[in-house]
Amino acid sequence: CGTGVSTDYLCHLNPGADVLGVDISDGALAVARERCQRSGAAKQVSSLRQEQRSLLDLEGEGPFDYINSVGVLHHLDQPEVGLRSLADRLAPSGLLHLFLYADAGRWEIHRTQKALSLLNAGTGSEGLRLGRELFETLPEGNRLARHHRERWAVDCAPDANFADMYLHPQETSYNLGCLFAFIETAGLHFAGFSNPEVWDPARLLKGELLERAQALPPRQQWELVEQLDPDISHFEFFLSAAPVERARWSDEALGLARGLVQPCLWGEPDPILGSNMEPIQLSDADRSLLRTVAEQPEQTLGALASPNQIRDLVDRQLLLLKE
């Protein structure tokens, strides 16, 4: 639950659901409750509970169709125990979304943490004072100071965020190999990144290099991206209790399917921002198709567009398919 950001939007995006948010911090829960009260989140769902509990203490809860755990497991003394606790409460067809620290993109954070530890800075107000003084004292050209200014200074303006980044007493970060080994400890299956564009080699390569990259199996493509982009500081991804098979739609099946415009797009009457608030470009034909699908939800797609146009919008996550 934390301060309720994800609890809030999950309520609004899943009307009629039963929602449980847990956190060990009473202060964070107070913020979460006020946030959800102001937004009217509880009115969107069948039930909303926000409780001061550990994710290790969820006996009698579940099974859940969807579990969202962001920035929690990597702060546990035994992250694998926390993962198994969540896995035990996942419905057979459910999804678990995790956010975990990535090792390579946090090198400057790890060095700063180690330096402050060697200086016996502590984790309280003294550590906060010394940590901020450290960045003010380091020479301007120092890589740690430069990376802090360029990447983290804005996020760390609040003292709580600075302490969470540089003074947290318990933290684990992962590379891809360790990440998949971690997933296997709970018997779960990797179901994809929630930010797949970050792991697309086309973001970094072109020409022959991109062709060679795209010929690799998916996991090796991701390993390549991990090596080429040292600024990736976290993993965000979905896990499932059972393997998820990607649906393969023939031209005939596409023609018989009905469509649903992605409900997380922004802009009326035509979307201008995607589900991640990224600008999207639509041709006149695409704009017309999305409008028609919204106005005629029971119309089969074959009567409205070609299979190639439908597939393109589906691949861009602008159009969802219904049998």
What feature does the model see in each segment?
Residues 5-56:
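Class I SAM-dependent methyltransferase SAM/SAH-binding core
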Residues 56-67:
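A short acidic, Gly/Pro-enriched loop at the edge of an enzyme's catalytic core
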Residues 65-79, 102:
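A short SAM/SAH-binding and catalytic strip from SAM-dependent methyltransferases
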Residues 80-92:
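A short glycine-rich, Lys/Arg-flanked "PGG" loop and its adjoining helix->strand segment in the class I
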Residues 95-147:
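Conserved class I S-adenosyl-L-methionine
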Residues 109-115, 148-169:
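Short, glycine-/aromatic-enriched active-site segment of Class I SAM-dependent methyltransferases
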Residues 171-190:
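Short alpha-helix
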Residues 204-228, 234-235, 278-323:
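Long, charge-rich, low-complexity alpha-helical segments
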